[in-house]
Amino acid sequence: MSFDLLIQGGTVIDGTGAPRIKADVGIKGDRMTAIGELSAGDAATVIDAAGCVVAPGFIDVHNHMDGWLLKQSHVPSKTLQGFTTEVIGLDGISYAPVNEQTAREWIFYLKALDGLQLSDYEGWESLGEFMQCLEGRNVQNAATHVPYANVRSLACGFGRGSVDDYQMRQIKDVVRQGMEQGAVGLSTGLDYIVQCFADTDELVEVCNVVAEFGGLYATHMRYKSGTMRALREAVEIGRRSGVKVHISHFKGVDAAAVAVNQIEDLLPRPIDARPRSCAGPARCVSVFIRHHRTSQRAWR
């Protein structure tokens, strides 16, 4: 047998739940074509994996790599840990969808997190256009959510207040466009800028669109209102809209049993709700200050 790449002598864990095995892996093109005892095979490249685990690439379902995937062709801090796919657009904040004005605002807001400069902006507006900009830029794969703060800022700006009917139509159109362009779901960060002004009814209406596509609602809940109260809201959004719910970095590991009981008690019918826990103290806060010179002087 002939391969482009032969990985020999490793311990294969295939991700299916099957027991680990000692095996070789043969690859041709971008496909694994054989797993087993392949010592008789030849290949252009041979990797000695003795003492190592050979596994499918890991998917990082919560990160803020949005800008780094655009700026760097290779991020060793992720690939050396085995991450081959990044799911971006989390916590309701990213670099798309935008218009010319909100693009500037989001680049400024996310500067410390993702490091993009205005000079890095290539004119994208829709989520699909931004993902197209990522194509071929980085060795990793990428999937994205529709980030709700970006969507809401397009319709309502960055101020307080609830949405009116016209703004809601705009929001739903942009979310629908994002889902049609391949987004896996909608993300929110309800402690953060813009989306903190969205009430439960607003989020249910938007998630109705996401549910049409079988998408996911990934939420950094409204933790500042109290973990259990925030949990009740997340479950209600899933129940009323029919959307699948993913709770980002659940803050309350010591109350996990209470949280599970809370979810079960709240469900008159089953919904797909899954928490992902935050095992340590939160380490990120955000302060949004208008970057007009007079505001900066007042702050200093």
Placement of each model-derived feature along the sequence:
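Histidine-rich, glycine-flanked metal-binding segment
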Residues: M1-G57
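Active-site environment of divalent metal-dependent phosphoester hydrolases
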Residues: D66-W68, I93-P97, R152, D191-Q195, ...
